[in-house]
Amino acid sequence: MGRRKKGRAVSGWIVIDKPAGLSSNAVVGKVRWAFDAQKAGHAGTLDPEATGVLAIALGEATKTVPFVTDALKAYEFTVRLGQATNTDDGEGEVTETSDARPSDDEIRAALPPFEGDILQVPPQFSAVKIDGERAYARARAGQEMEIAARPLYVDSLTFIARPDPDHVTLEMVCGKGGYVRSIARDLGRALGCFGHVKSLRRTWSGPFELSDATPLETLEDLAKDPALDAHLMPLETGLADLPELPCTPEGAARMRNGNPGMVRASDAEYGETAWASYNGTAVAVGTYRAGELHPTRVFQHGAL
């Protein structure tokens, strides 16, 4: 018999407005401790100095993390023009400078090439692996390396404000795997003046918004208090981008055992990923085929 996991079998989502100076994993650790949860994980890393929406899943909700990770996310960020750094943000050393400053119209005109399906080279200081080692570890050791470009979908890149000649604030909505620091670096080069990220805030991630966020201070004040559970959002929130297929009690029982189960008529396409529900409660995620859901993830969070 396997060893019982420590902590409570609590399930759901909580959104934290991550403060600057903490890693995403450090915030996950604080959340897991505060809820005394058996399991916790986040749906998309934020750099330590970045702030904003960090969606964290507890318990059975961790099975829905991939669907939030795959969803679009929005970032508001300020680019410092005229300086390149070795980290592509304000934490690194300045490596190149320029006195050139583009006009607002020149900046707007430079944005469209960064939209749509693009190829992006991650920063030297990033978590991508090069020959089995994290790029940032090699960069800290003074090694320069070539990092292969990676595909990224950018839904939009929008001019927001120009606080002063040295700074421009933009909003980017993109898919998973994007580095805002790389956008700032490459935009600066395209403008002929260099650039790096001065500040970065994630404003939404899939179904989760800043208005859903719990301040870290509240989390710490209510740690181990049952009242903290009131801040949890349902597991089903992480499935918002997938079709919901209501099922019968018999279908739910079959899916709970890992077998295909009957679902009621829906608009889901044959072969589409969807989730089955019974009385609004998620039963399983899987592939829809001819009136049945073939489960790939089954939720065990209470009787149906």
From Swiss-Prot:
Signal peptide: none
Active site, per annotation: 47
Region listing for Disordered, in residue ranges: 85-105
Key words of the record: Isomerase, tRNA processing
GO molecular function: RNA binding; tRNA pseudouridine(55) synthase activity
First-level EC class: isomerase
Pfam families, sorted: TruB_C_2 (PF16198), TruB_N (PF01509)
Claim: Isomerase is one of the keywords in the record: yes
Reaction catalysed by this enzyme: uridine(55) in tRNA = pseudouridine(55) in tRNA
EC number(s) per entry: 5.4.99.25
GO annotation (BP), single: tRNA pseudouridine synthesis
InterPro entries the record matches: PsdUridine_synth_cat_dom_sf, PsdUridine_synth_N, tRNA_psdUridine_synth_TruB, TruB_C
SUPFAM superfamilies: Pseudouridine synthase (SSF55120)
Family to which the UniProt record says this protein belongs: Belongs to the pseudouridine synthase TruB family. Type 1 subfamily.
Function: Responsible for synthesis of pseudouridine from uracil-55 in the psi GC loop of transfer RNAs.
UniProt protein name: tRNA pseudouridine synthase B
Taxonomic path: Bacteria, Pseudomonadati, Pseudomonadota, Alphaproteobacteria, Rhodobacterales
Name of the encoding gene: truB
